[in-house]
């Protein structure tokens, strides 16, 4: 008798732990704070863009790689639906899955707050950001409020859509210092 493979609808915890270990938030904050010590606002922005964009790019590419290596039943069904409908639901359902993996890993979120998911737009919100908190604690509140860390999320979302061959405009719609949360969106280009 052939034993059936157990189906899991949850993200693999080993995968999440591996990403969390490889993309340690405290190490990132330390590296950034050392690099910007004594620098002007413009220099902080430039250094932040370089450091954080690289982190976001590498995070998302590793997330997609591991997400494919550790599929769950939810993802398998999602891919079947996308294939069955000739890719119609690829935007924004597939990107959402990889964003959930990335944020669940580094932020240890149970759920990523999705504000909108439609065939034309994906928007999500971050209310409690450990990267922003680490920057405020290590570099000071004024440096954190410059929001150089936004380049992590903007780059991650942009790279994700590019690598999935989805044309999208990526925006930051809200920021923690101004709005009390960060919100990012990807809008499908027609």
Residue ranges and their predicted role:
Residues 1-151, 167-181, 189-190:
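N-terminal accessory segment detector
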Residues 164:
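Conserved ATPase active-site switch/coordination loops adjacent to the nucleotide-binding site
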